[in-house]
Amino acid sequence: MWEPKNLLSPCLLLLLGERPDHGYELVRRLRPLGIVDGDTSTVYRTLRSLERHGCLCSDWAPSGTGPARRVYRITAKGRAELLSWLATLEETRRRLDYYMRRLAPLIENRHGA
């Protein structure tokens, strides 16, 4: 079954576009999107990659209950990248809709046979 692992970057940009956050909380916010199953190291690698490419910036912020946490923020370049992803996702949705319209008669014929 297909897993949306290639959607991790745009999902992180989306969440950070909504508000700055630290890694652990981003992992928690990704779960309802079906992006993270158990291996969180991919999330942290992707955050570092997005930061290296200038899509995010980060700094250390004190935590009320423990050590300081790295808080990530989206940059102007990250917002532009997010808009680019929007166009890609809209095109993907258009293609999937076309596929589903063609698939529907095949499924109906199979159940009717």
Each model region followed by its residue ranges:
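Basic, amphipathic "hinge/linker" alpha-helix immediately C-terminal to the N-terminal HTH DNA-binding motif
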Residues: 64, 68-86
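Amphipathic alpha-helical dimerization/coiled-coil segments
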Residues: 80-113
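Short beta-strand "wing" residues that participate in macromolecule-binding interfaces
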Residues: 58
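Glycine-centered, phosphate/nucleic-acid-interacting loop/turn motifs that mediate DNA/RNA or nucleotide
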Residues: 54
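Short secondary-structure boundary/capping segments
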Residues: 48, 63-64
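Short polar/acidic secondary-structure junctions
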Residues: 35, 61-63
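Short, hydrophobic-biased segments on the C-terminal half of alpha helices
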Residues: 44-51
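N-terminal helix-turn-helix DNA-binding core of bacterial DNA-binding proteins
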Residues: 2-44
